[in-house]
Amino acid sequence: MGWHVAKVGDRWAALEPIRQGMTLAFGSIAPKVALGVALRHDWGTQYTANTFVNEIKCWGFTDTPAFVGEPECNGCAERFMRTLKEQCLYLHQFRDLEEARAIIGAFIAQYNAEWIVERLGYRTPAQARREALREAA
């Protein structure tokens, strides 16, 4: 999965990190490239929009919205967003979108490389991903 900073959080903005993730994981954005991959999201309007639903279906994702009223279904993502807000967003007043992208990008890179996460067995996200990919191979 990628990340994206935009002024408007619409369905187009919601699709961008998915495009980034597909390119990184599969080398391209193409129909059915993500077959077998489940995409968990909440019930925000950007994720329920026909454009969003049709795009992820075309790419082969299994659409798995979180259960209404049960944020723990999406707990890892929700916890990361809380950390991002508390450790990055609330500490800065960005001059513009470019500065926001630079600072947020640096935080995400540091988080993935250095942040020890209990849920991941006290490993960094990068370590957990490498080990998961190695086990899947």
Segment roles from a protein language model:
Residues 1-137:
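Charged DNA-binding/catalytic regions of mobile-element recombinases
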